[in-house]
Amino acid sequence: MSVSFRDRVLKLYLLGFDPSEIAQTLSLDAKRKVTEEEVLHVLAEARELLSALPSLEDIRAEVGQALERARIFQKDLLAIYQNMLRNYNAMMEGLTEHPDGTPVIGVRPADIAAMADRIMKIDQERITALLNSLKVLGHVGSTTAGALPSATELVRVEELVAEVVDEAPKT
């Protein structure tokens, strides 16, 4: 499988060669002289493609918003879960209405367990999403490939894990 001219230009550029060196190097392999203008054209196309991509800050903001939406959704589910427990306990006591006058709704234990599982799954998904985003941003967010997440980002992971533990359904 042959490597395209564009791919060769980009690989050499990423290795630190300047456009004139790339043109000279590729001219040695080619059956014709490669000009610096051709190399610059390929690099300009690559820059144009990259400029259309969202910035790391945009990606971080989107991840943060998605995690916040998941947290809010999870809190809503947790409130439903707690209401299910309240109704189940009242039902087990033989009550037909709560002290505040609201009617007792019949709830099955299987429904309560399914809701608890869903809440815990959201916890796992939130932590996994945050860790994956930190891993990706660590690879592309610095000049050193594979850089570790910043201390602030690690603190955010610890806060999320603590929040998940605090909000876990208790049966």
Curated annotation (Swiss-Prot):
Q: What keywords are annotated for this sequence in UniProt?
A: DNA-binding, Viral genome packaging, Viral release from host cell
Give GO terms: molecular function aspect only: DNA binding
InterPro entries assigned: TerS_C, TerS_N
Similarity remark: Belongs to the P23virus small terminase family.
Give the protein's biological function: The terminase small subunit binds to the packaging initiation site and regulates the ATPase activity of the terminase large subunit. The terminase lies at a unique vertex of the procapsid and is composed of two subunits, a small terminase subunit involved in viral DNA recognition (packaging sequence), and a large terminase subunit. Both terminase subunits heterooligomerize and are docked on the portal protein to form the packaging machine.
- Can you state the subunit structure given in the record? Homononamer; forms a ring-like structure through which genomic DNA is translocated into the capsid. Heterodimer with the terminase large subunit; the active complex is probably heterooligomeric.
Q: Report what the protein is called.
A: Terminase, small subunit
Organism source for this protein?
Thermus virus P23-45
